[in-house]
Amino acid sequence: MSNKKVQSPKEESIAKMLICKVHIGTKNLENKMKRYVYTRAKDGVHIINLAKTYEKLQLAARVIVAVSNPADVVVVSARPFGSRAVLKFAQYTGAQAIAGRWTPGMLTNQIIQKFIEPRLLIVTDPRTDAQSVKESAYANIPVIALCDSDSPLEHVDIAIPCNNKGKESIALMYWLLAQEVLYLKGSIPRSQAWDVMVDMFLWRDPEQFELKNLANEEAAPTAPHLADNQYATEAPYDDWNKKDDWNDNANEEWKNPITVDEW
């Protein structure tokens, strides 16, 4: 009989957070983020309390599920490391994803073509996504944000304390949030593990793909030798080296002039 202890969902999630360095904050500390900091390391980096991270993650998932239409939830990431994560989160939950630059006025200017009216906004970083957070305050839209130790909490309704600068941390947080949303909706039972891997939410550098493709092309086997092919045989050089007189093969009829009667 195995003595291995079965982890609870909370312990399992926190263990994954430790692996992906969700608890690693920054050396700077926002005053309102003090409640989420567990301690400060010797090098000055603040360590985030993952128990509070898990609690806020559960709260955020319940708020997302409370929105009747999933398309009314907009998830934003101006940070490149979060672009793939927000797209995958939107794919599995039915939300709208905006990866990259935020067009100013999307929540306030009804004239522009990209104007939207969501009921909930999720941002990857309230500092890099400050424009969308500011517009949501004008439109009275609640905001859920992944907040690091130095993140401003102005206009943020639910702050999920975590490392929002590492690509592994961002991918895991959106994966856990999407998993909890699917659990609450009943799309997958809690007794069953989600078959989607965290790697699907992980950002990948396009340059690495290009280098990998070049390496594969260089390592690819060359074309088979065409020695046995009939088209690869050498031409007979003896025939080309013969000196023939073209006039010798001409018949006598060619030398005679053509008469009018023959036409």
Curated annotation (Swiss-Prot):
Origin superkingdom: Eukaryota
Compartments reported by the entry: Cytoplasm
Pfam families according to UniProt: Ribosomal_S2 (PF00318)
PROSITE patterns: RIBOSOMAL_S2_1, RIBOSOMAL_S2_2
Keywords attached to this entry: Cytoplasm, Ribonucleoprotein, Ribosomal protein
Xref: PANTHER family: 40S RIBOSOMAL PROTEIN SA (PTHR11489)
Protein name according to UniProt: Small ribosomal subunit protein uS2
Gene source species: Plasmodium berghei (strain Anka)
